[in-house]
Structures are given as structure tokens and as C-alpha cells.
């Protein structure tokens, strides 16, 4: 696996509150290797060891870079309010699929059902764009518009997804535990933020970090998005090189 330098600094992580964890009473003992000893708690909360965070975040960046260079597809999941906007922006910048409103149970494990819903969603979007809904009786048009609105909310971020994702990035494993369990069941690799109350053994690769702070979530996503974009550029460059070689 290609290893690169991702410019992850302690000052930036401190400024983004990446190190701030939960109340010491809420911690998961499995997180002990990733947090500072009890004597270094701040106002009754655990503090994440940022040296550990930097190591795992750098590893995650290496992983997504290499995956993107192989043209793998990513799904970013973050349905908590504090994460929704950052997830949307990150997905747009990295050209990834995303879920930032509500995770529908079985979205991945019942993929055939999800595909059916996606086909209906795309069909309704086409009809609306072409003005076909306006030609229908008001009652019928209103029903279809409500259906379209519901599908947009639940499936809008995956409307172009034609197969199961190769990697899933999860912001809060407790909030989106159902999504994580579906990935585990299907064997889809996962990268997850883990706060001091999380289980570090669930995701394929865990990044110890504050998953309740907008600034922390944004910081982690920015690093991962940059790595994904760099990987995609690498893929394009390699593709162009192969074409030039075939020309000679």
C-alpha cells in the first residue's frame, strides 16, 4: 500500500477540538489505548491521544487514496444534525455517495429493494424535469410529488449508486450503528470515527476523534476527501499514461 504524507498536525487537531471526548462515566473501556490517562482528563471528560489519532487518520488517508486510485466507490454516512452539512459538502467534493438524513434499514443488505426504489426515484425525477407531472390531475400529481420528496430525502445522496459501495465512511458508529452492522454483514470495509464512548473493534479502520463537534467532523472529512481526490487524480493520470503507451 502506498504511504504518503498528509500534513496532519497536532495544532490543527487541537483547534478543531478533535481531542475532546465524553464524560469519563460514559467511556468504553476498550478505548483505553486511544485516550490519555485519567490524570489528564479535562473538566470530567476524557481526552483522545492525538498522536494516536494522527497515526490512524494517516493510515485511513492511505487506504482511501489507494482505493480511489483503483476507482473504488465510497459511501459517506453521517445522519446526526451536526454532521449532515459536512457530509454533504465532503461527498460533493470527493464525488462520493452519501446518506446524511436517515438510514433506511436494509439499505445495503436488501440491495434489490433499494435498487427498485432508486429506479422509481429516477423515473419520478425524469418525469418532473420533463414537466409530465404537470399534465396529470392535481390529486395524482400531488401524490407523486410527495413520493418524490420522500425519496429525495431518503435516497437523494445515493441516486447515482448502481452497486454496493466498496468502502463506507461512518461519522458516528452509535448513531448509525445499523449502517455499520449492514457493512459488517456484507463484508464491506468501513472507516469510522470513534469517540471515547465507542467500540474500536467494530469498524475495519477506526479513527479516534470527537464525533460530536462540527469542527472535528469537518477536519477529519477534509483530510479523507483530500486523499480521495488525490487518489482519483492518480487514477486519471495512470489511465492517460496507459493510453499514451498504447498509441506508440
Swiss-Prot record:
One of its GO terms (biological process) is translation. It holds the Pfam family Ribosomal_S2. It is found in: Plastid, Chloroplast. The keyword Plastid applies. CDD domains: RPS2. GO terms for molecular function: structural constituent of ribosome. InterPro entries: Ribosomal_uS2, Ribosomal_uS2_bac/mit/plastid, Ribosomal_uS2_CS, Ribosomal_uS2_flav_dom_sf. Keywords: Chloroplast, Plastid, Ribonucleoprotein, Ribosomal protein. The keyword Ribonucleoprotein applies. Its main location: plastid. Transmembrane segments: none annotated. GO terms for cellular component: chloroplast; mitochondrial small ribosomal subunit. Belongs to the universal ribosomal protein uS2 family. This is Small ribosomal subunit protein uS2c. The gene is rps2.
